[in-house]
Swiss-Prot record:
Its EC number is 2.7.7.6. It catalyses: RNA(n) + a ribonucleoside 5'-triphosphate = RNA(n+1) + diphosphate. Part of the RNA polymerase complex. This is DNA-directed RNA polymerase subunit Rpo5. Keywords: Cytoplasm, DNA-directed RNA polymerase, Nucleotidyltransferase, Transcription, Transferase. Belongs to the archaeal Rpo5/eukaryotic RPB5 RNA polymerase subunit family. The keyword Kinase does not apply. It is found in: Cytoplasm. Gene3D superfamilies: RPB5-like RNA polymerase subunit. Its main location: cytoplasm. DNA-dependent RNA polymerase (RNAP) catalyzes the transcription of DNA into RNA using the four ribonucleoside triphosphates as substrates. GO terms for molecular function: DNA binding; DNA-directed RNA polymerase activity. One of its GO terms (biological process) is transcription by RNA polymerase II. It comes from Methanococcus maripaludis (strain DSM 14266 / JCM 13030 / NBRC 101832 / S2 / LL).
Length: 78
């Protein structure tokens, strides 16, 4: 089963690496300030994201309409 095909799962997409500096500038943040997403997350595995990638997550909200947020993929520490 593809997790992304479930109606409750928001859209996840990898931001191209060359666009990350623009995103950091837009929000006046550093890479380490993004919320984290583990590289073992089932959706991360499904879209092929690797540590260092930034994932754009777009979901629909009944109050805000479309809501977009970003997460940094990090390696799982063992």
């Amino acid at each position: 089963m593809k997790i992304s095909s479930h109606e409750m799962v928001p859209t996840h997409e990898i931001i191209p690496r060359e666009e990350i500096p623009l995103l950091l500038e837009k929000y006046s943040i550093k890479m380490q300030q993004f919320p984290k997403l583990l590289d073992t997350d089932p959706l991360v595995l499904e879209i092929g994201a690797t540590p260092g990638d930034v994932v754009k997550i777009t979901r629909m909200s009944p109050t805000a309409g479309e809501s977009t947020y970003y997460r940094l993929v990090i390696a799982t520490s063992l």
